[in-house]
Amino acid sequence: YSNRASTYPTSLRLIRGHDIAGAALNDLLQLWGVDFTDPDSASCELAETIGLFCFSSIAGLNEMNDFDRPVVINLNNQWFTLIELDRGSASLKVDNTIHSVPVAELLDAWSGNFTLLWRAPPGYKAPISIGDRGPAVDWLVNRLQVINDRTGPTTPGYVFDGELEVQVKQFQLTTGLTPDGIAGV
C-alpha cells in the first residue's frame, strides 16, 4: 500500500469510513486485484462474475485470525476493510489509506458481523454435498488430503459420499464453521 498504517494506533473516532458497504467491498476487491469502475456499486453479485464469492457471518477476533483474510466490517455505522490484527491493534483500509486503531476500540464498535471473499475452486457452481461429483468435488478431496497430511492419488470423478461428508464436518469444526457437511457457502 502507498499509505501504510502508522506504528501508533489512531482513535477510531478520528477515522472516517465509507457510508455504504459497496465502497468497503470495493476496497476488499482491490486487495484481490480487482477494481470496479464505480466503486460504490461493488457487490457480491458482481464479485461472482469474476469467480469470487462472499461469505457473511458473525465471528470473534480469534476466528478472524483463523480466517487469515481481509474482511468488510461495520463500525459505528461506517464500513471498513479490516486487513490485519496484530498485538492490540487493527489495520483498517479506507480507499487507499491504512489506519491502525486499538483493538479495544474496534471491539467496542463491532457487532461481529463480517463479509469475506473467497475464490471458487475449478468447476464450483454451488455448495457441494452428498451425491455430487465433478471438478469441484475432486478439488475438495485433494485439498482435504493436503490439510490432513494424507497422500495418495485421487481418481477424477470422485463422488461426495458419507466418508467425505465426515471429513468436511471435521474441517468445519476445527475452523469454527457450522459443521453441516456441505462444502461452500
Where on the chain are the PLM-derived regions?
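Extracytoplasmic/periplasm-facing segments of secreted or lipoprotein envelope proteins
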Residues: D19-A24, L28, K125, S129-A136
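Acidic/histidine-rich, surface-exposed loop or edge segments in extracytoplasmic proteins
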Residues: N3-L12, L116-P127
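A structural motif
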Residues: S111-A120, L140
